[in-house]
Amino acid sequence: MNIIEGSFEAKGKKFAIVVSRFNHFIVDSLLDGAVDALKRHGNVNDEDITIVRVPGAYELPLAAKKIAKKGEADAIIAIGAVIRGGTPHFDFVAGESNKGLAQVCLESEIPVSFGVITTDSIEQAIERAGTKAGNKGAEAALGALEMVNVLAQI
């Protein structure tokens, strides 16, 4: 029986982090968590991490697609925070961002890790950005590290 599993070691691999500026007070903590995870768990150097800032979560898929087409990243990490308000805007932005990022991943065959938190309140967002519920940016980075290694073995 052959079992393929990923590890976190990724020295020499290139990572792009596409980051939404909207809700930056939350997103900055998610970004810090992602960068820390890449360096600490993946042994990734600063020069192998590219950070691309876009206006909001809706713009993440287009930037990820452009990065994937260039072929210079082994994995892409998408980071953002969509917080529910009083209108259906939340549903459109969260759904289209998720769908677009999944499409980029499947079409490019490059891991696109989903670090976009979708919450009902600012309090929930804060919890997912490094307090009670861990840091979802760090979790997305760990997923990217593992997938780079899994795909290299398939």
Swiss-Prot record:
Keywords assigned: Riboflavin biosynthesis, Transferase
Residues at the catalytic site: 89 (proton donor)
Record's keyword annotation contains Transferase: yes
Gene Ontology terms: biological process: riboflavin biosynthetic process
InterPro entries found in the cross-reference section: LS, LS/RS, LS/RS_sf
EC nos: 2.5.1.78
A Pfam match: DMRL_synthase
GO cellular component, one term: cytosol
MF term (GO), any: 6,7-dimethyl-8-ribityllumazine synthase activity
Broad EC category: transferase
Keyword Transport: no
Binding sites annotated in the UniProt record for (2S)-2-hydroxy-3-oxobutyl phosphate: 86-87, 128
Pathway membership: Cofactor biosynthesis; riboflavin biosynthesis; riboflavin from 2-hydroxy-3-oxobutyl phosphate and 5-amino-6-(D-ribitylamino)uracil: step 1/2
Binding, 5-amino-6-(D-ribitylamino)uracil: 22, 57-59, 81-83, 114
Catalytic activity annotation: (2S)-2-hydroxy-3-oxobutyl phosphate + 5-amino-6-(D-ribitylamino)uracil = 6,7-dimethyl-8-(1-D-ribityl)lumazine + phosphate + 2 H2O + H(+)
Disulfides per UniProt: none
Family stated for the protein in its record: Belongs to the DMRL synthase family.
Classification via HAMAP family: Lumazine_synth
Function noted in UniProt: Catalyzes the formation of 6,7-dimethyl-8-ribityllumazine by condensation of 5-amino-6-(D-ribitylamino)uracil with 3,4-dihydroxy-2-butanone 4-phosphate. This is the penultimate step in the biosynthesis of riboflavin.
Subunit and interaction comment: Forms an icosahedral capsid composed of 60 subunits, arranged as a dodecamer of pentamers.
The protein's name in its UniProt record: 6,7-dimethyl-8-ribityllumazine synthase
Lineage: Bacteria, Pseudomonadati, Pseudomonadota, Gammaproteobacteria, Alteromonadales
